[in-house]
Amino acid sequence: MKTHFAIFLITLFLFQMFSQSDAIFKAIWSGIKRLCGKRGLSDLYDLDEMFDGEISQADIDFLKELMR
């Protein structure tokens, strides 16, 4: 009975390791395909628009309203 349980645990461990590595390989492959695609390299500059280094007077007024 102990042998069956040990074989079951080893099989369960190997199956879990295989299923997790498959998900990691899929994520890596999809990232490579996204970067090397036709529009993959041109989409990298989208993050630059998210940050605006200048704060306008309207932004300061809005923050003052929030802090009241």
UniProtKB/Swiss-Prot annotation:
UniProt tissue specificity: Expressed by the venom gland.
Chief subcellular location: secreted
Signal sequence residues: 1-23
Subcellular location: Secreted; Target cell membrane
Removed propeptide positions: 40-68
Superkingdom of source: Eukaryota
GO CC annotations on file: extracellular region; membrane; other organism cell membrane
Entry-annotated residues carrying Cysteine amide: C36
Keyword annotations from UniProtKB, A to Z: Amidation, Antimicrobial, Cleavage on pair of basic residues, Membrane, Secreted, Signal, Target cell membrane, Target membrane
Entry's transmembrane regions: none
Function description: Amphipathic peptide with antimicrobial activity.
Family listed: Belongs to the non-disulfide-bridged peptide (NDBP) superfamily. Short antimicrobial peptide (group 4) family.
Note: Negative results: does not show antiviral activity.
The name this protein goes by in its record: Peptide Hp1412
Annotated organism of origin: Heterometrus petersii (Asian forest scorpion)
Organismal lineage: Eukaryota, Metazoa, Ecdysozoa, Arthropoda, Chelicerata
